[in-house]
Regions:
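Short, positively charged, Gly/Tyr-enriched micro-motifs
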Residues: 53-138, 143
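Arginine residue identity/basic-tract feature
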Residues: 5, 9, 17, 21, ...
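Long C-terminal interaction/binding lobes of large macromolecular proteins
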Residues: 3, 7-9, 102, 115-172
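Short, conserved DNA-binding cores of transcription-related domains
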Residues: 1-64
Length: 172
């Protein structure tokens, strides 16, 4: 990530500002959907280390921690499901996913929609309208950052990070 300047970051664990430096990179695979087909990309993820000893992976918003699928891949699957563009079987075939994977994403989306909006507002807002609102924001990063700060996990992340972990948003 070209824009990341480790010397300006604040460690989300100890709070030290300017104590991080580039530590390493690791490879990661990510499934996306391009030109009508699922595509697997290989990415290089930067890791920082703080003087307190904690290391941190710098993930762009389109990567969901602990998921091999990209955020926009999952949102596209869900959008096509909510729009009822095809049968569930065809949808799963088109995106090369299992029915159980689709159900997991649907359950997770509904749960996190309710967490974000609150139970009553969630019942009033359709899943499709919530999804559209996410995608129509001027900066998805604002929502993603607010979600992490509020719930200590990324949107559509299936579980909280292993303890002891202090996922927060890096920033100057």
């Amino acid at each position: 990530m070209k824009g990341v300047r480790p010397e300006l970051q604040t460690c989300p664990c100890c709070g030290a500002r300017g104590a991080c430096r580039i530590h390493a990179c690791y490879g990661r695979s990510l499934v996306d959907f391009i030109s009508g087909a699922p595509v697997c990309h290989s990415l290089c993820i930067m890791r920082l280390i703080c003087t307190c000893g904690h290391t941190h992976a710098i993930l762009p918003d389109f990567i969901i921690p602990y998921s091999g699928y990209g955020l926009f891949f999952i949102l596209r699957v869900l959008a096509e499901y909510f729009l009822r563009l095809s049968t569930v079987e065809r949808l799963c075939e088109r995106f090369s996913i299992t029915l159980s994977q689709l159900r997991c994403w649907l359950d997770l989306f509904q749960t996190q929609k309710e967490e974000w909006l609150g139970a009553l507002s969630s019942m009033e807002a359709s899943s499709l309208s919530f999804l559209k609102a996410l995608l129509m924001q001027a900066a998805y990063s604002d929502f993603a950052s607010a979600f992490v700060r509020r719930f200590t996990k990324s949107f559509l992340q299936s579980h909280k990070n292993p303890a002891p972990y202090c996922q927060q948003v890096f920033g100057p």
